[in-house]
A protein has these predicted regions:
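Pre-P-loop entry segment of helicase/translocase ATPase cores
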Residues: 431-465
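Glycine-rich, charged/polar anion/phosphate-binding loops
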Residues: 147-149, 355, 446, 452-457, ...
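Extended, folded cores of ATP/NTP-driven motor/assembly subunits in large transport
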Residues: 2-445
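Glycine-rich phosphate-binding loop of nucleotide-binding enzymes
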Residues: 55-62, 70-72, 79-91, 188, ...
Length: 491
């Protein structure tokens, strides 16, 4: 027994002596580790710098601009005609342009500011003000308390619309800068003609938006302040230091540390169009995510609706329409039409499109329609949100499908400028990009949402869950009669 112990000790000592005689490889190992590229989500974001003089963002391969627009409270034929003319004659050809409708639950700051003049007074003021604030914050986090017979997804949200566009960057090209500045003026004037006022988004606005979309917290109701670092690239400032992502077949899991230091996980799911909708109207587009007549057909979780479109070259589409028409016309005059009778209808459709393209009455547009939802990391919450999205849009004639195995791709497509960096071509190769005429695409734009009315006053949420305040003397409400107003609050 003693011999075995002595042999074991001897073997251990010999191993240590041999290890000490070997050359030290720690320095080489450290050099190897230092040369390795570890995966960072910020590395795939294109944002680099912002030029405040021109209002342009400098990205990896592109240069572009971004607007924040006020959502339309409604629409009519004249607004649709103005937007169709904008798509057909004002947008650059072959350039992806993205429209983003963001439904945010970060309404805590707006609630505090809006209720500052409607606060309780007296000895119990602090207590009752806290109860009122907690009531509305709880409604934004989950939903308003209703009787058991009324299980409606009524909550509080803030809707915002963003428009982004970028073109391939040319080195040391002053002409391109001037062209982009002119493009900004043209688009803002055209959107103003459709009663859509805009403002140019700067670097701080972009970073704040991206930090909200990339670093979600299902329990956070307040915007987290962030001070922009002028000496660091924008893409690194968009991602939280504690960011973590897990990619699965059915969803994305984004984790981060909350303000309390505890880890919070959000489940992100994407949906895109299975086929072109047969009929769509701009004035009913808001009913797809918050139906007024059927409130149960609403999306209660935070979401982002993204429509990325690219107006195709007019000459190429004219040639394509001519070739298609001649091909189906030839088939319609043979026995082929007896076995496939739809070829007659197809010939008529391509004939009409060819005529409208030849007279510049329309243009063909390639577009990608995507919805991204944010829910708590639970199967029940994810399934409930999925049914809300699919059922709400099915009511409006839209057939959506979950982006199984492609949630990361769709998540990246949701981000501004990402499609202009080459992702749109990947979407086309994947077969998820649809084609339609400018009139149909104008009716698909996600730009209709309820108005917040006034920044402060009597809190009166809308049926579409928009956080709104009523102040009859606020100039932004465009009131013309101030003779008498009667209002009341709880208590």
């Amino acid at each position: 027994m003693s011999n075995n112990i002595i042999d074991a000790v001897t073997q251990t000592v010999n191993s240590l002596v041999s290890a000490l005689k070997l050359p030290d490889e720690s320095a080489k190992a450290n050099d190897t580790l230092g040369s390795m590229n570890f995966p960072q989500f910020s590395r795939i974001l294109p944002y680099k710098d912002y030029d405040s003089a021109t209002g342009l963002f400098i990205n990896n391969k592109t240069i572009g601009f971004m607007f924040e627009a006020r959502p339309l409270p409604g629409a009519d034929k004249s607004i649709v005609a103005t937007l169709e003319h904008l798509l057909r004659s004002k947008l650059p050809r072959g350039v992806p342009v993205s429209f983003h409708l963001v439904s945010s639950k970060l309404v805590g700051n707006d609630i505090d500011y809006g209720l500052r003049e409607f606060r309780w007074s007296g000895k119990q003021a602090k207590k009752f003000n806290a109860i009122t604030q907690a009531y509305y914050l709880r409604a934004a986090e989950t939903k308003f308390p209703l009787p058991p017979a009324l299980d409606l997804p009524l909550t509080l949200r803030n809707y915002r619309v963003y428009i982004s566009c970028c073109v391939p960057r040319k080195k040391n090209s002053t002409t391109q800068i001037v062209e982009m500045e002119n493009q900004i003026k043209i688009l803002r004037a055209s959107l103003g003609g459709a009663y859509i006022p805009t403002r140019i988004l700067d670097a701080a606005g972009l970073v704040e938006l991206m930090r909200e979309l990339i670093n979600p917290d299902p329990h956070e109701m307040y915007r987290v302040p962030y001070k922009l670092d002028p000496y660091q690239d924008l893409n690194y400032q968009c991602v939280d230091d504690s960011f973590d992502m897990q990619v699965t077949a059915g969803h994305l899991k984004i984790g981060r540390l909350g303000r309390d230091g505890k880890e919070c996980v959000t489940r992100v799911t994407s949906y895109h169009l299975e086929s072109d909708p047969e009929m769509a109207f701009l004035w009913t587009s808001a009913d797809n995510y918050a139906n007024l007549l059927n409130p149960e057909l609403s999306i209660s979780c935070p979401f982002v609706i993204t429509l990325t479109l690219m107006v195709e070259d007019q000459v190429k589409t004219q040639n394509e329409a001519n070739m298609k028409f001649m091909d189906v016309e030839k088939k319609s005059k043979t026995s082929y039409a007896k076995f496939f009778p739809n070829v007659i209808k197809e010939m008529q459709e391509w004939g009409d499109i060819r005529q409208r393209l030849a007279t510049n009455q329309t243009s063909l547009v390639s577009y990608f329609f995507n919805i991204t939802t944010y829910t708590a990391d639970s199967t029940e919450a994810s399934l409930a949100a999925e049914q809300q999205v699919l059922n709400s849009y099915r009511k409006g004639g839209f057939q959506l499908i979950p982006a199984r195995y492609h949630h990361l791709r769709n998540f990246l497509a949701m981000m501004p400028f990402k499609c202009g960096e080459g992702l749109f071509k990947e979407l086309q190769a994947a077969g998820v990009v649809k084609r339609a005429e400018t009139f149909q695409v104008a009716n698909l734009l996600p730009i209709v949402a309820d108005s917040p009315l006034a920044p402060a006053g009597l809190l009166a949420p809308t049926y579409r869950n928009q956080l709104a305040f009523i102040d009859l003397f606020y100039e932004g409400m465009n009131n013309t009669n101030f003779n008498m107003a009667v209002c009341g609050t709880s208590g």
